[in-house]
């Protein structure tokens, strides 16, 4: 047998960055079909608006909750076709990660992990309302995060006008 041993002891890995998903779950789900059954006779194509938010909060030492909040509204000339609200959460344990890397993880990687589940739940909910499944396009969470941080940097660098 070869003398190479690839088994790392706990002492060797205790200082390495570790991230794990402790749980993921629907925190809130609402599907409204206020104009059924008349809506199924409407001929106009609905306009669909999607709003997306990410929220985070610490739950315990090294444990964070990440919430993906999605609000989908479909409207036609005749009225509201359907409305879906979903809050899907993940509980993440983050250990030995540098402090400056925690926020990017919570706003980029954690949502990227949760998004496929959000997409499926929304598609199933809309389909179960007797509409074609709503298939959300993939979201570039890294680009969104960079855009948000740039906007925050610009706002913090803008000095208020003083009085003369």
Curated annotation (Swiss-Prot):
GO biological process, one term: protein tetramerization
Keyword Protein transport annotated: yes
GO cellular component: cytoplasm
Gene3D superfamilies per record: SecB-like
Keywords, comma-separated and alphabetical: Chaperone, Cytoplasm, Protein transport, Translocation, Transport
GO molecular-function terms, A-Z: unfolded protein binding
Subcellular location: Cytoplasm
Coiled-coil positions: none
UniProt keyword annotation of Zinc present: no
Family, similarity comment: Belongs to the SecB family.
HAMAP family according to UniProt: SecB (MF_00821)
Subunit structure, as described in the record: Homotetramer, a dimer of dimers. One homotetramer interacts with 1 SecA dimer.
Function comment: One of the proteins required for the normal export of preproteins out of the cell cytoplasm. It is a molecular chaperone that binds to a subset of precursor proteins, maintaining them in a translocation-competent state. It also specifically binds to its receptor SecA.
NCBIfam families: PRK05751.1-3 (NF004392), secB (TIGR00809)
Name listed for the protein in its UniProt record: Protein-export protein SecB
Species the sequence originates in: Zymomonas mobilis subsp. mobilis (strain ATCC 31821 / ZM4 / CP4)
Classification lineage: Bacteria, Pseudomonadati, Pseudomonadota, Alphaproteobacteria, Sphingomonadales
């Amino acid at each position: 047998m070869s003398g190479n041993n690839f088994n790392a002891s706990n002492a060797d890995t205790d200082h390495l960055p570790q991230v794990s998903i402790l749980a993921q779950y629907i925190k809130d789900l609402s599907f409204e079909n206020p104009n059924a059954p008349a809506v199924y006779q409407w001929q106009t194509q609905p306009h669909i608006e999607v709003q997306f938010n990410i929220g985070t909060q610490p739950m315990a030492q090294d444990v964070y909750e990440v919430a993906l909040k999605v609000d989908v509204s479909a409207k036609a000339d005749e009225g509201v076709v359907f409305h879906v609200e979903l809050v899907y959460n993940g509980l993440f344990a983050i250990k030995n990660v540098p402090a400056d890397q925690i926020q990017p993880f919570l706003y980029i990687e954690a949502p990227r992990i949760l998004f496929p589940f959000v997409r499926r739940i929304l598609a199933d909910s809309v389909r179960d309302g007797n509409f074609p499944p709503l298939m959300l396009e993939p979201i570039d969470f890294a680009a969104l995060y960079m855009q948000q941080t740039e906007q925050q940097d610009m706002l913090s660098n803008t000095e208020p006008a003083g009085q003369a």
